Amino acid sequence: MGMRRFLLLLAMLAAPAQARTVTATVYDGWYHNRADACGGTYQHWGISAAHPWIPCGTRVRVTHQGRSLVVPITDRCDCNSIDLSAGAAYRLRVPLDGVAKVGISY
């Protein structure tokens, strides 16, 4: 196998299984210290996210305007996007009172 083929194969294996752009929203502070769908307790300023179908415990890389953060899925949401904890949104510079387009890969 030539070096070029080897590098191509290596790049394909290193690529994330799924990558897409979605709308991110931020959890309301009302949920702080309440049970989440995956068996934990939601911490508003912690690093976590909710998604409608990505399995609980999956670590998702979220990217926004050049910033990137690995966030565990700890809850479910009734949306076609991702809900970020305030702590995750703050680190990614997602507006705490709005929505933003983000990239996710897992």
Language-model-detected regions and their locations in the chain:
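Elongated periplasmic alpha-helical coiled-coil
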Residues: L10-A14
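Sec-dependent signal peptide recognition
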Residues: G2-L9
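Secreted/periplasmic proteins
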Residues: F6, A17-Y106
